[in-house]
């Protein structure tokens, strides 16, 4: 790329061979030959790219030329993508082939400049030295370094990007004029940025653009660089050494340069396509996140100062035997680890190695660990000696058959008893009963152990789906059997088959009307593929523990059916029934909230029993039509009569107070509105967009920000971070207020017009 620092990146027209035809401009000649490569939707953007390539700006670099070719290739129909080539016959040679594979335009870069050939014409450009340009440019050195570069950058913009580049330049000018240290260029749709930005800028924010690369010669004194949610495929090795914090999450980066900024302390590369890390990462690095990439191995020696390492969701089969000695947080879940290093860092506080294939843990773990997650592995035992500082341990979904003998005597150093979660493991009934007995004793002071009810040692054979359905619909015709047999190829059909068999063993089958209810529901599923898909998904984890989890899953399926009916128009002509359906969903959400409160206060109870217990016991008092009558383990739910009385009162009060606002924002009601009042809906949405796009939204955000009076901190970066967090939170709040106002207004108008507004009055007396 042309180096602005030493040789100014401008060019001059040097020679022309074969006079240009005055009849048809080159860009039109080329376009006439390749217009068929592009759909009507992409024609304008493709034409702009061709115009650029036929007459590149003076500051054109190989990277910029390549980006235009990449853009054309992306816009073209797949059948013509290979007619647009770059790096052809060399890193800096680009060309376009006609439909019959004849070269009609080429651009070749060399050390002296570049040559454009097309339509029998050849134009060569050479670079101009900085002194040559300076002699012809008016203004100060600042004008050359900034205004000239920025104006050329704006001129190069594709049509749809030009206005946003102008906006970016205005922001840079504002920073330059007012000596601001933060430059925010996010959500502008930028495909490039100028290499030169105001030198006082220390924080550069480029999030949510369309950048495919960063400048090779990015200048300035940047300390913080954010370029999340772009289309970056690589990182230049020449980024300023001043950078201390860099976030490049949600891009397409495949590899890192061997050299990163030497001052780098924090690097976040979440959700990219990186397969390996450089051996020599910056020694100043303290925070490293490569969560959700494709990394197979880590460097043997990571920087010794790293305190937080996140390598979650990669393809690691092992961790380095020697990890940074000061490491406090290690997140390595969702990999293919089979073991951990024999010796872990002595100051480790958080260790997450969930969703791996680990069969055994080190017998001695660092005593400083407060949070340990080893769930979803292949462990058969837990260590006898747990870390002294342990506050919570998640070991669900392993192959544990016993608990450490020392567990009841473990005393953690924390203010609360340690919580050890071992749900969905194949414990024997004796192990569960012994743990229950120990924890129920008056003088027990050990950890709180939580596991799911039910016998995990029983292996249930999953029948073909059509056979499971026949258990409920005994009079099925052969045609119906074949229909359900065809459904067996659908995703999660086997899970639903197992669910149906298990449902037949629940307490609810004692009631004849329950079987009729399920039979009618199954006939509905046979006719509705979308509802069937939703129900099959819910069935995925329905049979992993006890009978009551199956019943709870059935409740969730009935709730999903109710919502599905509302969204698909079943209540469009029956708004009274829709409002009653909404009231039931509201009550169920309130029950879930209260159940979560109860679970937090319990010592040793399966949360399934608490959730189902409230639903089951409040079925009649709250008129819950989708709930079943019975459950098996209510006696161990920990729910008291006073809990039920309090829950009933709180839910009824909440419904009288809040249902009006809740219903206005309910998604299924919005679907109904779009169908029964399309004009009013469009007007309301237009009004909502206007609130956001005009000054009203930002003015309200600014007013609340000003009321907060965020004090200046001695740490300017910290003040900026607090300011940004506050602005984000206020923006969400203002948006929720706008939604509530507009959706409530349209709801009241439509219900009044339909003469059912009285149904929104307080329900409970």
UniProtKB/Swiss-Prot annotation:
State where the protein is found. Secreted; Host cytoplasm
Q: Which cysteines are joined by disulfide bonds?
A: none
Region annotated Linker, chain positions: 452-461
A GO BP annotation: protein ubiquitination
Keyword Translocase present in the record's keywords: the answer is: no
Domain (NEL) spans 464-758
EC identifiers of the protein: 2.3.2.27
Q: Which reaction does it catalyse?
A: S-ubiquitinyl-[E2 ubiquitin-conjugating enzyme]-L-cysteine + [acceptor protein]-L-lysine = [E2 ubiquitin-conjugating enzyme]-L-cysteine + N(6)-ubiquitinyl-[acceptor protein]-L-lysine
Repeat (LRR) positions are 200-219, 221-242, 243-262, 263-284, 285-305, 306-325, 326-346, 347-368, 369-389, 390-410
GO: which molecular function terms? ubiquitin-protein transferase activity; unfolded protein binding
Q: How, per the record, is this protein's activity regulated?
A: Binding to TXN is inhibited by hydrogen peroxide in vitro.
The keyword Repeat belongs to this UniProt entry's keyword annotation: yes
The cross-references to Gene3D superfamilies, in alphabetical order and at most eight, read: 1.20.58.90, Ribonuclease Inhibitor, Secreted effector protein SifA, Shigella T3SS effector IpaH defines, Shigella T3SS effector IpaH domain
Which residues does the annotated region (Interaction with target proteins) include? 1-451
Q: What coarse category fits the chief subcellular location reported for this protein? A: secreted
Q: Where is this region: E3 ubiquitin-protein ligase catalytic domain?
A: 462-765
Its domain description in UniProt is:
The LRR (leucine-rich repeat) domain forms a slightly curved solenoid and may mediate interaction with target proteins.
Subunit info here reads: Interacts with host TXN.
- Homology family: Belongs to the LRR-containing bacterial E3 ligase family.
Q: What does this protein do?
A: Effector proteins function to alter host cell physiology and promote bacterial survival in host tissues. This protein is an E3 ubiquitin ligase that interferes with host's ubiquitination pathway. Can ubiquitinate both ubiquitin and host TXN (thioredoxin). Leads to significant decrease of thioredoxin activity and increase of host cell death.
Name of this chain's protein: E3 ubiquitin-protein ligase SlrP
Q: Kindly list the organism's lineage.
A: Bacteria, Pseudomonadati, Pseudomonadota, Gammaproteobacteria, Enterobacterales
Instruction: Write the gene name.
Output: slrP
């Amino acid at each position: 790329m042309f180096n602005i620092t030493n040789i100014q990146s401008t060019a001059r027209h040097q020679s022309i061979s074969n006079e240009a035809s005055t009849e048809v401009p080159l860009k039109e000649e080329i376009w006439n030959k390749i217009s068929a490569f592009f759909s009507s939707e992409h024609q304008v953007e493709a034409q702009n790219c061709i115009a650029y390539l036929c007459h590149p700006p003076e500051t054109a670099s190989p990277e910029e030329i390549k980006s235009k070719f990449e853009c054309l290739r992306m816009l073209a129909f797949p059948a013509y993508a290979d007619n647009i080539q770059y790096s052809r016959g060399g890193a800096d040679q680009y060309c376009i082939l006609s439909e019959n594979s004849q070269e009609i335009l080429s651009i070749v870069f060399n050390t002296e400049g570049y040559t454009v050939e097309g339509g029998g014409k050849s134009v060569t450009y050479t670079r101009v030295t900085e002194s040559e340009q300076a002699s012809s440019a008016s203004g100060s050195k600042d004008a050359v370094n900034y205004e000239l570069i920025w104006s050329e950058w704006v001129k190069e913009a594709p049509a749809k990007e030009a206005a946003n580049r102008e906006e970016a330049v205005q922001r840079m000018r504002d920073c330059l004029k007012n000596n601001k240290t933060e430059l925010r260029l996010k959500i502008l749709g930028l495909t490039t940025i100028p290499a030169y930005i105001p030198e006082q800028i220390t924080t550069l924010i480029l999030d949510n653009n369309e950048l495919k690369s960063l400048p090779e010669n990015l200048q300035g004194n940047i300390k913080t660089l954010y370029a999340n949610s772009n289309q970056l495929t690589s990182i230049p090795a020449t980024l300023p050494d001043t950078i201390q914090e860099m976030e490049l999450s949600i891009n397409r980066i495949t590899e890192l340069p061997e050299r990163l900024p030497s001052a780098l302390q924090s690097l976040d590369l979440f959700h990219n396509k990186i397969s390996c890390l450089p051996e020599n990462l910056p020694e100043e690095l303290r925070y490293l996140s490569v969560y959700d990439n494709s990394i197979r191995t880590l460097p043997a020696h990571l920087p010794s100062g790293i305190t937080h390492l996140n390598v979650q969701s990669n393809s690691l089969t092992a961790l380095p035997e020697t990890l940074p000695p000061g490491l406090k947080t290690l997140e390595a879940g969702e990999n293919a680890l089979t073991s951990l290093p024999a010796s872990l860092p002595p100051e480790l506080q958080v260790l997450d190695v969930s969703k791996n294939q680990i069969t055994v843990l080190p017998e001695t773990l660092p005593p400083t660990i407060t949070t340990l997650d080893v769930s979803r592995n292949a462990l058969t035992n837990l260590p006898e000696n747990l870390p002294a500082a342990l506050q919570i341990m998640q070991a669900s979904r392993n192959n544990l058959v016993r608990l450490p003998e020392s567990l009841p005597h473990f005393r953690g150093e924390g203010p609360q008893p340690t919580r050890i979660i071992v749900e969905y493991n194949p414990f024997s009934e004796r192990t569960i009963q012994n743990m229950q007995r120990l924890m129920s004793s008056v003088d027990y002071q050990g950890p709180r152990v939580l596991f799911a009810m039910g016998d995990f040692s029983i292996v249930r054979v999953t029948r073909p789906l059509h056979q499971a359905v026949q258990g409920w619909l005994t009079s099925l015709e052969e045609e119906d059997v074949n229909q359900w047999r065809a459904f067996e190829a659908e995703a999660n059909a086997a899970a639903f088959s197992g669910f149906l068999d298990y449902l037949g063993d629940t307490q609810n089958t004692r009631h004849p009307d329950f079987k009729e209810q399920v039979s009618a529901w199954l006939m509905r599923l046979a006719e509705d593929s979308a509802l069937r898909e939703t129900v099959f998904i819910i069935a995925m984890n329905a049979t992993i523990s006890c009978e009551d989890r199956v019943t709870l899953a059935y409740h969730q399926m009935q709730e999903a059916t109710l919502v599905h009916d509302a969204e698909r128009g079943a209540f469009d002509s029956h708004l009274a029934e829709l409002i009653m359906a909404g009231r039931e969903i509201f009550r169920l959400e309130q029950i879930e909230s209260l159940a979560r409160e109860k679970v937090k206060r319990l010592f040793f109870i399966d949360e399934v029993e608490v959730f189902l217990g409230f639903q089951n016991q409040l079925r009649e008092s709250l008129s819950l039509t989708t709930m079943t009558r019975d459950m098996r383990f209510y006696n161990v739910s920990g729910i008291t009569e006073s809990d039920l009385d309090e829950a009933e009162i709180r839910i009824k009060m909440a419904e009288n107070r809040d249902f009006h606002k809740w219903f206005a924002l309910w998604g299924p009601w919005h679907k109904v509105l779009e169908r029964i009042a399309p004009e009013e809906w469009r007007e309301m949405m237009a009004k909502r967009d206007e609130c956001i796009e005009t000054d009203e939204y930002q003015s309200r955000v600014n007013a609340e920000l000003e009321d907060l009076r965020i004090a200046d901190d001695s740490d300017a970066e910290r003040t900026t971070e607090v300011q940004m967090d506050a602005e984000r939170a206020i923006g969400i709040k203002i948006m929720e207020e706008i939604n509530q106002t507009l959706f409530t207004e349209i709801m009241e108008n439509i219900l009044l017009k339909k003469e059912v507004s009285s149904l929104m009055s307080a329900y409970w007396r």
